[in-house]
């Protein structure tokens, strides 16, 4: 129960009383990766997140661990090479949250990609990204392209490229990395905001003053080094330090829409260019839905709640109907949406899509380290870079030595399945185990595929008598209880949006079962009547934002 909601008080007691080699501010994928790398090396690590884990950018991506084909278009060769190699590592270390997905790249007359350039581009991509033989690109004729996805626009179609991307659940990837870090000894807590830094007599950062957002308690965490990994909030965090540099972020917003496959029967993931501005976007089938995105527009409004506007929805509907003209989707067909912010490093005079996705480490005179920019795919390598630097500083300043990075072959939580090649066999073996408990085969397969080597704990929850009084389907009940016991879920939206993904990919379950879920959480976590009211309102607000176009200007008025 290393990351249990029931251990919050125990974790807070340790955070108050101990001194840490490293305190990390930010509980997205970057912070999680740093916590895992540092704790695996033997550092004493603490991590604080002001909202829920992955609530910022790390639950709002296109949900691909991809090699970045579009960066080849911009001649960012190094980015392609590194992300391609990292992608393979991310998959191997957690095949339960990442899965290979063949991607179709249709080529139309006058489109971004011609046959020759696509063949050369994908070939270069294979070589740079170190793509394994079975996943190397294929070039398809017009007939073969339509056989893969008959909905693709036939007019002007010349053929297609076929290559592999990796689909992931970004929020679950984050929580699995976080859980493994906690197993390695990291003290990790959500709903805890860093307010100020503390300094020693030499004006070096030596701690963080925090506030528990659930109880309003204030306390100080003592640290030898502090890393700011706050994503879109890194500038806000740095503003509390006297020694910041002149670098800054430029935020852009990306939006996705979700449509049921009864309306948009997409059978094949497609990467295509839009008619309006030539931007490349994805259409990806998942769990009986198709999701499409993303947009890329400058954003300077409330960081904690970027919203999908009607303009965003219209843009993506137009893009779908342009590339898949027979489906005729309308705004009413959108079941759910999400919007996320990319924390990019400011480059003067560049359009949103032109700004590099590279990451940088900034070191202030105060000793505060900030990691900015970067991509989901590169989280492990980014962590390695900054923890190498932390290790160097701890040796120089304190004479401490730690082992080198060891995350390349380190499975994340749930990833102990005998490697990616064995994953399918592992799942079937767990399905057989579940049959002995009387658990439905399809439910067992979904749970084993999603939770990997942690699935036995969910099967055990299924044996408890409380389930029968819960008014919930077994699958939802065991996921909910597990997420409270093992994944620090405190509010209903933590579960509905981030641990289960239902707010995006099965909003009907949210509408049908939200009241029962809140009842169970109120009972398990001893909510007050005021909390029940507040959290119910938060769920209703999240549903509204997901289902409708919102009137949110790009710049705060």
Swiss-Prot record:
Enzyme kind, highest EC tier: oxidoreductase
Named cofactor requirement(s): FAD
Protein name listed in UniProt: Aerobic glycerol-3-phosphate dehydrogenase
Record keyword Cytoplasm present: yes
GO cellular component annotations of the record: cytoplasm
Domain of life where this protein originates: Bacteria
Family: Belongs to the FAD-dependent glycerol-3-phosphate dehydrogenase family.
Any GO MF annotation of the entry: glycerol-3-phosphate dehydrogenase (quinone) activity
EC number(s) given by UniProt: 1.1.5.3
């Amino acid at each position: 129960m290393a990351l249990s909601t029931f251990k919050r008080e125990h974790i807070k007691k340790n955070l108050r009383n101990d001194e840490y080699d490293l305190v990390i501010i930010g509980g997205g994928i970057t912070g999680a990766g740093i916590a895992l790398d540092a704790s695996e090396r033997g550092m004493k690590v603490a991590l604080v997140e002001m909202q829920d884990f992955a609530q910022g950018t790390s639950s709002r991506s296109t949900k691909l661990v991809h090699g970045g084909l579009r960066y080849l278009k911009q001649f960012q060769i190094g980015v392609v090479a590194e992300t391609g190699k990292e992608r393979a590592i991310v998959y191997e270390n957690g095949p339960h949250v990442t899965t290979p997905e063949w991607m179709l790249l249709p080529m139309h007359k006058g489109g971004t990609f011609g046959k020759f350039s696509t063949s050369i581009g994908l070939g270069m991509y294979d070589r740079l990204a170190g793509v394994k033989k079975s996943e190397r690109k294929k070039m398809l004729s017009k007939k073969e392209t339509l056989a893969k996805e008959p909905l693709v626009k036939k007019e002007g179609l010349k053929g297609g490229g076929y290559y592999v991307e990796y689909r992931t659940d970004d929020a679950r990837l984050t929580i699995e990395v976080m859980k493994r870090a906690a197993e390695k000894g990291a003290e990790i807590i959500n709903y805890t905001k860093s307010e100020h830094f503390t300094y020693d007599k030499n004006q070096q950062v030596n701690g963080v003053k925090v506030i528990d957002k659930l109880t309003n308690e204030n306390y100080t965490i003592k640290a030898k080094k502090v890393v700011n990994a706050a994503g879109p909030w890194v500038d806000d965090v740095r503003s509390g330090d006297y020694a910041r540099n002149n670098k800054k972020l430029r935020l852009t917003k990306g939006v996705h829409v979700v449509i049921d496959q009864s309306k948009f029967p997409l059978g094949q993931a497609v990467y295509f260019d839009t008619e309006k501005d030539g931007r490349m976007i994805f259409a990806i089938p998942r769990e009986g839905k198709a999701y499409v995105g993303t947009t890329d527009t400058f954003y300077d409004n409330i960081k904690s709640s970027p919203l999908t506007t009607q303009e965003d929805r219209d843009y993506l509907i137009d893009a779908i109907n342009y590339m898949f003209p027979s489906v005729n989707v309308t705004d009413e067909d959108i079941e759910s949406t999400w919007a996320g912010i990319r924390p990019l490093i400011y480059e003067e005079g560049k359009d949103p899509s032109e700004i590099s996705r590279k990451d940088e480490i900034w070191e202030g005179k105060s000793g505060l380290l900030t990691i900015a920019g970067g991509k989901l795919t590169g989280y492990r390598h980014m962590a390695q870079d900054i923890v190498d630097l932390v290790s160097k500083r701890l040796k120089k300043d304190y004479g401490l030595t730690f082992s080198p990075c060891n995350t390349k072959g380190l499975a994340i939580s749930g990833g102990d399945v005998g490697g990616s090649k064995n994953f399918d066999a592992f799942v079937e073996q767990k399905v057989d185990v579940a049959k002995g408990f009387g658990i439905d085969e399809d439910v067992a397969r979904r749970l084993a595929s999603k939770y990997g080597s942690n699935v036995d704990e969910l099967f055990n929850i299924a044996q408890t008598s409380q389930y029968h009084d819960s008014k919930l389907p077994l699958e939802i009940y065991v996921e909910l209880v597990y997420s409270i016991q093992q994944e620090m879920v405190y509010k209903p939206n933590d579960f509905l949006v981030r641990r289960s993904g239902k707010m995006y990919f099965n909003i009907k379950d949210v509408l049908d079962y939200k009241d029962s879920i809140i009842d169970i959480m109120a009972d398990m976590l001893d909510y007050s009547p005021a909390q029940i009211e507040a959290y119910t309102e938060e769920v209703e607000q999240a549903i509204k934002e997901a289902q409708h176009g919102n009137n949110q200007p790009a710049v705060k008025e």
